[in-house]
Structure formats: C-alpha cells, structure tokens
C-alpha cells in the first residue's frame, strides 16, 4: 500500500515514514494537494503546536477535508490527531473534521512523556491486540471529543483520549514509531484498515 505523509514541516515525520516502511508500506512525503486527496492512506504526523502545524499544512488542509467528504482514510498521529478537531487552547483552529476542543493537560506532570498502558474502550480494527499495550506518549495537550469517537484512553492524572476513530478518520495521541512491537502492530493494523476502504 502507498502511504502519503502530509508534509507540514514537522521534524519527526521521517521516523514515521520509516516505521510505515518497516510495516510494508511504500511511503511518500508530499505537499501536493492532489496527491494528498487521491492517496490510499494519508498520515498527518508530527510533534509541536496545532497553530504552526495548521499553518504548515497550507493548501493541504482543503485536500484533507475533501478526503473526509469522499470517505478516504486519514490517520493523525500526535499533533495530527489534534488537528482533526475544531480548535486548540494553545491557539489556532484545527481542520474541524471531528467536533471538540484540544485542551492543555490538567495533570501535575506536563508534558505527559513516556510509556503508558493503552486502555481500549471501543472495538476498533486499528487497535486489535493492543488493549493494555505499553505505548509511548509525548504531549501537553489532549483532545476532548464532543461525540463518541474515542477508542482508547490513557491514565495521566485523569483519563485522556489516546485514540479516536470516526468512519475514515482515525487518530492516536501516542507515537507508534516510538512504541516498539505495539507500535509496529498498530501500523500493520492501520494498513489493513485503510485497505478496506
């Protein structure tokens, strides 16, 4: 399967590309709206702030909205998950593909950085075999969905959304490219999920 990573200038995108390559995908990094619109699977990945990521997307924002309208699979990773939502407390609007804000963590330890158990709360083909798996997080903000789209939670002072899925849209707050065997399994699950659309 060919995976296109939407290039918005994030620094760790190449490690995500390499992880998808190890999972069996052919991977391209692109700033071309047409390529992003037509790809079999698009991934929006990276670390950083919603405002700078949204600005970095430029014309790709419209391509991602078109994908959602056409039921084409899109995965957000870390700030990519946050971009799927309406807005962020750190400033800036997201894509508005999922309803709800992104808010700063209220926990005493911010950022949430390190390994935590994933708690699957709704069956999802992307999370098959991953309930209770240790995955790696590095974030200071978390999505608060208005709709029932959360598929996994993580405990960090209080339950936080760790994964979402709504039709062809999915996102994870953890970093599969840094999550060892569990992350590799998630990426294989993602490729199988995207192949079914």
Regions found by a protein language model. Name each.
Residues 172-197:
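Acyltransferase
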Residues 27-38:
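Short acidic low-complexity segments
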Residues 132, 165-170:
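Beta-strand-turn-beta hairpins that frame and shape the catalytic cleft
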Residues 86-160:
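Pocket-forming structural segment of enzyme catalytic cores
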Residues 35-36, 67, 163:
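Structural alpha-helical scaffold elements that stabilize or flank donor/cofactor-binding regions
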Residues 48-116:
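Cysteine-nucleophile active-site neighborhood
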Residues 43-45, 171:
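Structural motif
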Residues 1-4:
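Extreme N-terminal starter segment of soluble prokaryotic enzymes
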